[in-house]
Amino acid sequence: RVEEIFEQATKLNLKTQIIKHGESINKGMEIVLINSFGVLNYYYDYCKSIFIGKSLEKKLISVSGQNPLEAARAGCKIYHGPYVYNFHEIYEFLSKINITKKINNTDELAARLIQDFRTVKNINAKNIKKINIYGENILKKTTKEIIKLI
């Protein structure tokens, strides 16, 4: 899938790079595709906007969406499709504080990203504090449920 996205972005004359674990982002890139597991946190500091995968394709509804909290903590604007089953409550919370935005198709995503290219990254310390508290509460609830099972 990464190669297909790379080809489409290149056809649109967007400066695009595929990154594997440990590689640096080349200067002037407009789209960066990270093709490695467990390294996203390293790159979030360099991103204004991100798109969460597995959220636009209905066929992936049973495994839809990825956890957006780390990107939110880094101050990224987060776009996602309608299928965020795995993290529905988190997306609702982040939407209320204007960090996530649901998009319905790739054209809408493209329009949002083009708009974002013209802005600077805005890190809202109050929102990040809210996100951290929210994450801590999730951890506490999860820990309580695990203790019940032990």
Label the predicted regions.
Residues 1-150:
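Nucleotide-activated sugar donor-binding and catalytic core shared by glycosyltransferases
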